[in-house]
């Protein structure tokens, strides 16, 4: 078997990918296929080299339906890591906060962003210190809203003063405040909501977490997920991420997904909102070329 070996000596990088691949693979029947993990160590992993083919409308539709079932496999809460993984995750060179317990609504209110303060969310190198103990305010019996989570964990950490000027950060802050108010909250797709109603341990979708189109490999056997940043999240974020850089037969994927697991009304108007996280990540990693898009999204929803 022709293989690919990925190596990274930085703490937790390989472990996060290994855990994410295994977690997504648990849902791969009837969920989306996931690249097999052949072997791994603390700083490396091996996968088969996938054969790439041109996607077809049929393959796109099959992928849309399968992705709906992956999401419906569920996660305990927003920001949940793959089971067994400790610490924060990564999207490319950017840190990704993972919540090992659900943030309760009352505690989330006490820790609201208020201002999108500057922070260093990019990789500071292998010798940088990291928080040793979890924030005790990250637990409560009443789970916070999606908007509060999205503002605090997925937008604010990347609104740093190296990338954004003061006026731009102020606009992003307004978006964060509106998200925290709850007016932009919305439900998960139907299969995820059904799973939440059936299982008290499911509170969010099981998401790939970095589902730009390059992380979908089209093979002779159909679409295969690679390079996840797996987490508990909102299913619409995966769907929105597919469109950030364009995706073959995107409308076919959406239609098949929506047939298998109907999306909540107004989902098309929320695509850009759910793209804000991946755009902010790209700004943190690659600089100001992504700022105009982030500012446009903030202005639209703030």
How does the language model describe each region?
Residues 139-151, 200-206, 213, 217-269, ...:
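Active-site Asp-x-Gly
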Residues 157-166:
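Solvent-exposed, charged helical/coil patches
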Residues 25-28, 71-78, 162, 183, ...:
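A general structural signal marking secondary-structure boundaries and capping sites
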Residues 124, 282-302:
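ATP/Mg2+ or Mg2+-diphosphate-binding catalytic cores
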Residues 168-225:
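A mid-sequence, solvent-exposed acidic-amphipathic segment
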Residues 2-145:
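ATP-binding pocket architecture of kinase catalytic cores
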Residues 272-280:
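Hydrophobic alpha-helical segments that form the core
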Residues 161, 174, 251-254:
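Phosphate/dinucleotide-binding and metal-coordinating scaffold of catalytic cores
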